[in-house]
Amino acid sequence: MTIMRKSHPLMKMVNHAFIDLPTPSNISSWWNFGSLLGLCLIIQIASGLFLAMHYTSDTVSAFSSVAHICRDVNYGWLIRYIHANGASLFFICLYLHIGRGIYYGSYLYKETWNIGIVLLFLTMATAFMGYVLPWGQMSFWGATVITNLLSAIPYVGTDLVEWIWGGFSVDKATLTRFFAFHFILPFIIAATAMVHLLFLHETGSNNPLGIPSDSDKIPFHPYYTLKDFLGMIMVLALFLTFVLFFPDLLGDPDNYSPANPLNTPPHIKPEWYFLFAYAILRSIPNKLGGVIALVLSILVLALFPLLHTANQRSMMFRPISQFLFWTLVSDLFILTWIGGQPVEPPFIIIGQIASILYFSIILLLLPVAGLIENKILKW
């Protein structure tokens, strides 16, 4: 008689995905972020569900309902801060996961990579709408500024913005629909993540060397279940330390003031994980141009498989590409810093140079570096 996990229709799926899955024997801790993202999604859905039980999506009572959660609900403050900082953890894991994919050439699994980009867009949309819900000053003005960017679209822009707002400004209709979308999108993300895994298991995992590993595979369980579990414990320990000791470090103080349409904050800025894209948006002194650059800053990831010129998949043995990769990482840190600064010299020019460098490295320098490295290998 066959083992139940190999014969039962449901267990068989789990078995093929998490137990008997043949996995390269040399994947490093950089491959832990997929499971960590799954953990983040579970944390966010669970904490969000409990918050939704006490939250009111009405302009009059949204802000006070969040205060009520923090003051009167048992451990409401903890659930709220887990959810707020869980978003930051989610994006840290996301960016590290994408960085791993770029460094080790995982983008050559085109279907998996493209579904990953869709997941990134869905997560960014969810996070943006969630940021609006507490109805603080930065929530309101962030929603106003970011949604208003769509008015730059020729001909239909203004109508589109008013359609999204459900009126002539960000108001009750906007808040209600944002709450509805913020609630449903994580489940769509979970379903899309399943498709992401489906495509990944068609090809099998990449590995640090970037070479086929069919000759040296080991079962996922117990080796990588244990490794993932260790990663989860370490990240959860750091995360809970952060939540319990520095819960407001990444938040904006303006969000402790209720939304006031008559009083604009001096510096409107999104959460830290969007600042790099916000800096790219602001570096172009034209509304439509800025919006196009903003979208392209994420969409440019889809070009990685097309721009891969090197004979080797991974950057592990490509020093020129390595240098450019870490320059790109540094550039993203600079863009994140600039996104949080006011629009005045010298920040304007720094942001413009950093934006040009960002696109130059991805679209021009990395493909050229790949060709140069091919030439060096032939010598």
UniProtKB/Swiss-Prot annotation:
| Annotated localization | Mitochondrion inner membrane
**Membrane association type:** Multi-pass membrane protein
Q: Per UniProt, what is one Pfam family of this protein? A: Cytochrome_B
Q: Which PROSITE patterns match?
A: CYTB_CTER, CYTB_NTER
The entry's cellular-component GO terms read: mitochondrial inner membrane; respiratory chain complex III
Instruction: Give the residues the record marks as binding heme b b562.
Output: 83, 182
Question: Would you kindly state one Gene Ontology biological process term found in this protein's UniProt entry?
Answer: mitochondrial electron transport, ubiquinol to cytochrome c
The entry lists its GO molecular-function terms as:
metal ion binding; ubiquinol-cytochrome-c reductase activity
Arranged from A to Z, the UniProt key words for this protein are: Electron transport, Heme, Iron, Membrane, Metal-binding, Mitochondrion, Mitochondrion inner membrane, Respiratory chain, Transmembrane, Transmembrane helix, Transport, Ubiquinone
Q: Which residues bind a ubiquinone?
A: 201
Q: Which cofactors, if any, are listed as required?
A: heme b
Binding positions (heme b b566):
97, 196
Supply the PANTHER family for this chain.
Answer: CYTOCHROME B (PTHR19271:SF16)
UniProt miscellaneous comment:
Heme 1 (or BL or b562) is low-potential and absorbs at about 562 nm, and heme 2 (or BH or b566) is high-potential and absorbs at about 566 nm.
Describe, as the record does, how this protein assembles with itself and its partners.
The cytochrome bc1 complex contains 11 subunits: 3 respiratory subunits (MT-CYB, CYC1 and UQCRFS1), 2 core proteins (UQCRC1 and UQCRC2) and 6 low-molecular weight proteins (UQCRH/QCR6, UQCRB/QCR7, UQCRQ/QCR8, UQCR10/QCR9, UQCR11/QCR10 and a cleavage product of UQCRFS1). This cytochrome bc1 complex then forms a dimer.
Similarity comment: Belongs to the cytochrome b family.
What this chain does, per the record?
Answer: Component of the ubiquinol-cytochrome c reductase complex (complex III or cytochrome b-c1 complex) that is part of the mitochondrial respiratory chain. The b-c1 complex mediates electron transfer from ubiquinol to cytochrome c. Contributes to the generation of a proton gradient across the mitochondrial membrane that is then used for ATP synthesis.
The name this protein goes by in its record: Cytochrome b
Species name:
Chaetodipus pernix
